[in-house]
Amino acid sequence: FKIDSYANVVLQYLRLESFHDDLVLKRVPLEELVKEVVRKYAIFFIQKGLTVDLHDLDVAVITDRKWLLVIIEQLLSNSLKYTSTGGIEIYFKDQTLYMKDSGIGIKDSDILRVFERGFSGYNGHLTQQSSGLGLYLSKKIADQLGHQLQMTSQVGQGTTVAIHFEEKKLVMD
């Protein structure tokens, strides 16, 4: 699964070159998308004995489904890598999707650089589980979609990632 995951990240990175060629903006039901990703990673929740708390996700956002799926998969994968007890909470509030874990957290000196290409930080070096591309890719995709990706963290407490969806005035047919 690890090699598969790295290969997928590299392929998505290469696809960024033609990002706008297959961009399809439409209403995407968030709960359905999040549950799809959680189901994909269910075995890891079970193996690690982690809880998952999904709430307030009954909302649709204007985005490209496949690219948002890449972002959510990457963020959930990261949360699972660095969380060994407790769980992950995913919810929507004030035009923002939050993913909050009870993982090991990220040092203040690293949090400012987590979205840089190739940066894996202290945790990535410690666990040898980071390519340094996943969060970079997620940020690039979010920027291309017009979404804001932000992260806050406390060592020993966990990390919260927020994807903010700007209100768009699009004509839907």
List PLM regions with ranges.
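Conserved micro-motifs of the catalytic ATP-binding
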Residues: S18-L23, D56, A60-T63
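A conserved beta-strand-to-alpha-helix junction within the catalytic ATP-binding
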Residues: V24-A42
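Short helix-loop "hinge" at the ATP-lid/N-box region of the Bergerat-fold HATPase_c
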Residues: S79-L80
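Short beta-strand/loop element within the Bergerat-fold HATPase_c
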Residues: T85-T96
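Acidic ATP/Mg2+-coordinating residue in the GHKL
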Residues: D101
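Short conserved segment of the HATPase_c
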Residues: I106-F119
